[in-house]
Amino acid sequence: MPVTATSWLRPMRGGSQTHLIKASDGHHYVVKLSNNPQGIRTLVNEWIAQRILSYLKIPCPEIEIVDIPQSLIDATPKLGILRGQVMQAPPSGWHFGSRFPGDPAVLTVHDVLPDIQLVTCRNIHHFAAVLTFDKWLANADSRQSVFYRARLLDVLANEEKFPDPEYAMRGLVASMIDHGYCFNGVYWDFPDAPAYGLYYRAEVYRRIRGWADFEPWLERIQSFPESVLDKALHEIPRAWLEPSEQEELTNLLDRLLARRSKVPSLLEATKDRFPNHFPNWR
């Protein structure tokens, strides 16, 4: 069941004009509105992408459908989409929510870090992991992430490579966000390009020395179960889809499964086009 928006905190940065909202479950969400300038299909893309990332065990925020009541919209003039000089209010109803990783009054979240801090990120290897995902889903955006300090157990509990004794420690971690441009955004196709999904800071890829550094995620993609996509498809609110789009989306996911074997060649094309990002990959 959706959570209900109870209070608005502030607008967030970015082209989709998201808003930070507190919900009835006590959590805060970065909410992408259904009337956002990038199109309602980006909500569908976000939902499917998170379900795939979760199965692949790549850190990303929890998601919920956020029900925004008309009473909150009426009481909050800044809750909406700015088009030119006009603020366009969202429709009441169901929107996409990406859970903020803590209390925004206490937790500092960064979307950019200097290299001296970036190299201390405890799960920097997940940038190799998420690159496999971005290639598979034809993420036509650059890789977006946020960084914050957290108990490592809470973020890396499913991480096979992480040493157990350090689980109780706190450290700087990365969480992968902003997947509206997967499937080439509203176009729902797969126009592959070497730059797609690449993080703009080469430092996150310097530890990559070969194909082993993309495991176990490449293997998880190759054996990805259709049932995960079926479940995600049935979770998507019908209000986010036109009747004619249901079949189109089903066909898109069929094509996604059919291109799993293409991911290694897409990674190699990226390495060849941007060798400075992968100086140690031989």
Which residues does each PLM region occupy?
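Phosphate/dinucleotide-binding and metal-coordinating scaffold of catalytic cores
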Residues: 1-282
